[in-house]
Amino acid sequence: MKIIAISGKAQHGKDTTAGFLKSALEADGYKVQVAHYADLLKYICKQFFGWNGQKDDAGRHILQYVGTDVIRTQKPDFWVDFIISMAELFPDTWDYLLIPDCRFPNEIDRIKSAGLDMVHLRVVRKNFTSPLSKEQQAHPSETALDNTTPD
């Protein structure tokens, strides 16, 4: 299985890129799964914190707070280890596993150190004004990969 980790700022087209890749790869006969690190986070926020699923200011705050400020602070590899476990448990189920919400260096490094075949792509949306607040734009989940080089 080949893993493609896609990074980029909020609303720069990570999911759109994953959708294009999925369509193209499936057209060539490959089995493709799209899995977000945040899939499990969203479940936790809905089930345990009453999040309504909206990515408005309050929604982004709860996602950043639970996902980064609490869980990543205490267990930095929590999200990536879940995805690695899925890849290791089902190695022959998909030809490609696309992860369109890579936001931290360990989410790349940990997959590589697990011996999985991975490439890191970054999506950049030029001339785009972010609708996020200055505080949200400065959050580590938006800035942690600023000085890394994709493959």
Language-model segments: residues:
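Conserved lysine of the Walker
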Residues: 14
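Conserved phosphate-donor/acceptor-positioning beta-strand/loop module used by diverse small-molecule
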Residues: 96-103, 109-132
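Hydrophobic positions on the alpha1 helix immediately C-terminal to the Walker A/P-loop
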Residues: 17, 21
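Small-molecule kinase domains that catalyze NTP-dependent phosphoryl transfer to phosphate-bearing small molecules
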Residues: 77, 82, 121-151
